[in-house]
């Protein structure tokens, strides 16, 4: 794997990312969350996309794709490893979201091309990065209170918002992915909260990917609704 080639591709691709609001909706009808993980010791890449109706944030569709991992883990180049599975899950969706939240960084990346920006650009959809750990940049000490907020800065440029979404939890790093400015990114993430650390779209994507209790319960409720239709 030629790191110099990947770095050059990152730099060239980053220039195509749109960092301001570029969407027609005043309120999205459908919001998706995307999450990527690895199975079988990293040999298989698994991507899950959960599609939610807005503003109710009700799960209406999900897709999971598993593909053979074609690239080793290289710090700073994770998006190249993850996007093939994300594209496979995206292609299976029956509906297209108006807005996409990706578990990972957008422009808050050393070369400004995290997975949220890379994937958002590939599918040309307004995209927000919601990361759980800092990748680059610095921020002022954050208050312990829920809602505490600080800009993540790098070389004089704001890359993300550092936001404590839940009391006694580590903050999230919310960044532009593609076609969504920083102010709007924070706004839409805040509107997708329902008392957990993560916004509902990425929380549901994780639940789908990991077959968590919430997702099992949702499946059971759907099965019961199909078996006992309303009179």
From Swiss-Prot:
It catalyses: Endonucleolytic cleavage at apurinic or apyrimidinic sites to products with a 5'-phosphate. It is an enzyme of class 3 (hydrolase). Its main location: cytoplasm. InterPro entries: Endonuclease-V. It comes from the Bacteria. Pfam families: Endonuclease_5. Mg(2+) binds at residues 35, 103. Its EC number is 3.1.21.7. It is found in: Cytoplasm. Keywords: Cytoplasm, DNA damage, DNA repair, Endonuclease, Hydrolase, Magnesium, Metal-binding, Nuclease. One of its GO terms (molecular function) is RNA endonuclease activity, producing 5'-phosphomonoesters. GO terms for biological process: DNA repair. Its cofactor is Mg(2+). DNA repair enzyme involved in the repair of deaminated bases. Selectively cleaves double-stranded DNA at the second phosphodiester bond 3' to a deoxyinosine leaving behind the intact lesion on the nicked DNA. Belongs to the endonuclease V family. This is Endonuclease V. It comes from Sodalis glossinidius (strain morsitans).
